[in-house]
Amino acid sequence: MTVNVEQENTVLRLWLLLRRVGDTLVRCQDLVFSKYGLTTEQWGLLTTIKSRGPLRPSDLADLLNRTPNSMSMLIDRMVKAGLVRRTRNRKDRRVVTVSMTEKGKTVVEPAIPAGWEFIHEVLSTLSDDEQRDLADTLEKVKCELVGYLDPEADKVEILKNSLSNDPDLYKRMVKNLLPPGYEAKRTAGKRVGKSVVGRL
């Protein structure tokens, strides 16, 4: 069988790009959130609790795509930093939930708009159609990766339950995460925060 060198180069280039984009994205996010004394991991945990309320560590691990052990260590560090607290259920002491402290709330609230501004800045280079196509393509790649980790997973069900099929994702974010009036200011052209992309 003849090897299609051009196609194999494309496959290799795409795989390298996926890895490098992921690594660079985390570096950029760390730079954005470091101004608020947070890491990307801490920001993700705090925004999840802010959006959904107190959660069990196992639920946080599932939502943030982490192992139970790594989630436990992250929570330990954030408890020591005073950002979150663990609370045992009074009726069932085996059940523990993680909630945000006042310090955590104070720290994360200004970081959320900064993160949203960063997302818009990075993706502004793509047209609306390109953004939709990229999202659909990445969903397919994610589905294959999940299937690799769990051969018993139903890929059709994974795609059906993906974020891209949630029509209220943006509305929930505006309601639960962004400060009142922020989106009106942003869409009117009043940017919040300074650019970080140009410095990387």
Question: Which residues make up each language-model segment?
Answer:
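N-terminal leader segment of winged-helix/HTH proteins
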Residues: 1-36, 163-200
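Charged, amphipathic alpha-helical coiled-coil/dimerization segments
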Residues: 26, 77-140
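Residues within helix-turn-helix
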Residues: 57-58, 69, 76, 96
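Pre-recognition alpha-helix immediately N-terminal to the DNA-recognition helix
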Residues: 13, 17, 24, 28, ...
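Hydrophobic/aromatic-rich alpha-helical bundle segments in the mid-to-C-terminal region
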Residues: 4-8, 122, 126-129, 148-160
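Short helix-coil-helix linker/hinge
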Residues: 36-42, 70, 101, 126-128
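N-terminal helix-turn-helix DNA-binding core of bacterial DNA-binding proteins
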Residues: 27-67, 81, 152-154
